[in-house]
């Protein structure tokens, strides 16, 4: 099995984009991953929306900050909750090319990067 990558997505008011973001991560050719969406908002409707998105795949987890912490602290919280050997960040309004993780992991292993 490939080494697990924890993909951390800080979420704040990106409802119109986040599903496309999650789908782009799920469509990675490197599939040993978990997705941690760090909910950094107070709108309960958005939290329910994210919970629906999490039903797309059992590798998706929603972590609720319960108060506004900002993107940096949300990323830190994601790291604390992660299980992966590797950490990757993507913003909730971004997408990845399908081979992004595969190429990054391959490059790091090939060049003996210390983890």
Where are these regions (language model features)?
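Nucleotide-sugar donor-binding/catalytic module of glycosyltransferases
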Residues: 1-115
């Amino acid at each position: 099995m490939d080494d697990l990558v924890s993909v951390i997505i800080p979420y704040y008011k990106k409802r119109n984009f986040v599903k496309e973001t999650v789908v782009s991560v799920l469509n990675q050719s490197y599939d040993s991953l978990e997705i941690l969406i760090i909910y950094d908002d107070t709108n309960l409707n958005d939290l329910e929306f994210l919970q629906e998105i999490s039903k797309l795949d059992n590798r998706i987890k929603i972590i609720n900050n319960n108060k506004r912490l900002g993107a940096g602290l949300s990323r830190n919280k994601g790291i604390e909750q992660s299980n992966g050997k590797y950490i990757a960040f993507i913003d909730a309004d971004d997408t990845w090319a399908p081979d992004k993780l595969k190429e990054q992991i391959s490059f790091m292993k090939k060049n003996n990067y210390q983890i």
